[in-house]
A protein has these predicted regions:
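N-terminal [4Fe-4S]-dependent radical SAM core
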Residues: 88-95, 115-163
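Beta-strand scaffold of nucleotide-dependent catalytic cores
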Residues: 166, 280, 348-352, 421, ...
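Conserved non-cysteine loop/helix-boundary elements of the Radical SAM core domain that shape
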Residues: 181-380
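Radical SAM enzyme core and accessory elements
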Residues: 1-108, 112-116, 120, 129, ...
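Key residue(s) within conserved catalytic/signature motifs
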Residues: 143-147, 176, 255
Length: 489
């Protein structure tokens, strides 16, 4: 299936709506005559036209041009996208659970509409009618927005920020992963120079944050796999964090312990000793067959042993990640994994839906969406989490996620992950250290934003580290400008 879009300066919205029905369909700029197996959306001086052809059959829809936006009309792009959506919904018999929504932050939309003074009835209409969102998904997003409100008040306090520290090393690469990460065995010589630079960048972040008058709210050490570092390297990094920041005033300090094949009792003890209040142990599945298929070099029993060691080390706020839709998984196997996670009784369980990233091995090897299990049926099993006393506290979506579904963090009451909420709802400055880091500077509740990017690859980050430090000066410059804007005139 191919996508053709003509007559619009940008076909972004149409393209992504078509991919709700045909996830890997390529966009082709010049349609041939008598194109087959395609979706063709076009704006002409006469109106809007959309056509689908597949397996020798075809259907089409037409509509007049919308009224100008200043007169209350929709943009031509949204109108053409909506026309195409209606055609494909009828053609395929599929109603995407999030309707026409292609954005990654539906909960943020609810917060924004409320802040703008919309009534609950107006927000209901926006989701359910204008975007054809299902009642189930909308009610979940709305419940999450309600739960987040008091937490966002903490993150919205003027001058607060969170610190992200990235460790781009893994013992092996999972088949679904597209993140920039280095194989630990191949790139081990790079690890210590990387940690040395990382510690220096953390120190520079503290200097720039102090100059800007910022107060640290939460810390997140992620990856990659942070526990691919040695115990001594973890001590070096976390010792630098402790030496530069008052951890007693931090509401949350998370370290991704990640994979049991590189997480041992000593590392878990170091993480606890140096101030982390929350860790994540990520099985993804408790099926040994599925683990082997995605390239994990450990067993389900290794996960259970790692979890027991974490409890023994005193960790009392643990998240576990599961992924719905992994190659070779089934609804029944996913349910067993979910029940196993619930039986362990962690404070958080996060359920991700597999996303087909173009740089991941499962896409490069040309596996199709039909190769995957019924992911919607898997996510239906998350009712077991609610029955066990967990509640959803954050939600986000990604492009090319199987069956247009979502990722949801579930928690026991009082164990909401603050950093996850802050980064998803974009209400707080995030200062990022490490290769691939993206610092996001935010003021006025997200109305003004600026990004500062680190170099993407670890070797480039190390070799051009002086430039990394120079770019970090943009933090204080951003807030100097903001202060000057507020006090001038």
């Amino acid at each position: 299936m191919k996508i053709y879009i003509t007559g619009l300066p940008s076909g972004y919205e149409v393209e992504h709506l078509v991919r709700l029905f045909y996830p890997m369909a390529p966009l082709t700029l010049t349609p041939p005559e008598n194109a087959e197996d395609c979706v063709w959306a076009e704006k002409t001086p006469d109106g809007l036209h959309t056509l689908v052809r597949q397996d020798g059959r075809s259907a089409e829809r037409h509509a007049p041009l919308p009224a100008p936006v200043e007169q209350g009309g929709e943009t031509p792009e949204f109108s053409l996208a909506s026309l195409t959506y209606d055609l494909l919904r009828d053609w395929t018999g599929i109603r995407p659970p999030w309707g026409k929504m292609t954005g990654v932050r539906p909960v943020r939309l609810i917060h924004d509409k409320r802040a703008a003074g919309w009534t609950e009835a107006e927000i209901d209409h926006f989701f359910l009618d204008r975007f054809d969102c299902s009642q189930q998904k909308y009610q979940m997003a709305k419940a999450i927005a309600d739960l987040q409100e008091p937490i966002l008040k903490v993150g919205n306090e003027p001058g607060t920020y969170s610190l992200y520290i990235g460790i781009p090393f893994c013992p092996s690469r999972c088949s679904y992963c597209s993140f920039v990460s280095c194989n630990l065995d191949r790139d081990r010589k790079m690890v210590q120079p990387y940690v040395d630079c990382l510690c220096r960048e953390v120190e520079e972040i503290r200097i720039q944050a102090d100059k800007a008058g910022l107060k640290l709210c939460s810390i997140y050490i992620g990856g990659g796999t942070p526990t691919s570092l040695s115990a001594d390297q973890l001590r070096q990094l976390m010792g630098t964090v402790r030496a530069n920041f008052d951890l007693s005033k931090v509401v949350e300090y998370t370290v991704e312990a990640g994979r049991p094949d590189c997480t041992d009792a000593e590392k878990l003890a170091v993480i606890k000793e140096y101030g982390a209040t929350r860790i994540s142990i990520n099985p993804q599945t408790f099926s040994d067959e599925v683990l082997a298929g995605i390239g994990r070099k450990h067993s389900a029993q290794d996960i259970l042993d790692c979890y027991a060691e974490a409890r023994k080390a005193g960790h009392d706020d643990i998240n576990m990640d599961l992924i719905a839709g992994l190659p070779g998984d089934t609804v029944e196997s996913f349910e067993r994994s979910l029940r196993q996670a619930i039986a362990l009784d962690p404070e958080n369980i996060t359920v991700h839906t597999l996303t087909l990233k173009r740089a991941s091995r499962i896409v490069i090897e040309d596996q199709k969406e039909n190769d995957y299990a019924d992911v919607a049926a898997m996510l239906e099993k998350c009712r077991l989490l609610a029955e066990a006393g967990y509640r959803p506290y954050y939600l986000y979506r990604q492009k090319n996620t199987l069956q247009n579904l979502e990722n949801v963090g579930w928690c026991k009451p009082g164990h909401e992950g603050y950093y996850n909420i802050y980064i998803m709802e974009e209400v707080q400055t995030i200062l990022s250290a490490g290769a691939g880091g993206s610092t996001k500077l935010v003021t006025d509740g997200g109305k003004r934003m600026q990004r500062i990017f680190n170099f993407k690859y670890p070797n480039e980050y190390i070799q051009r580290f002086a430039e990394v430090l120079e770019r970090k000066k943009g933090v204080a410059d951003f807030y100097d400008h903001d202060l000057g804007t507020q006090t001038s005139g």
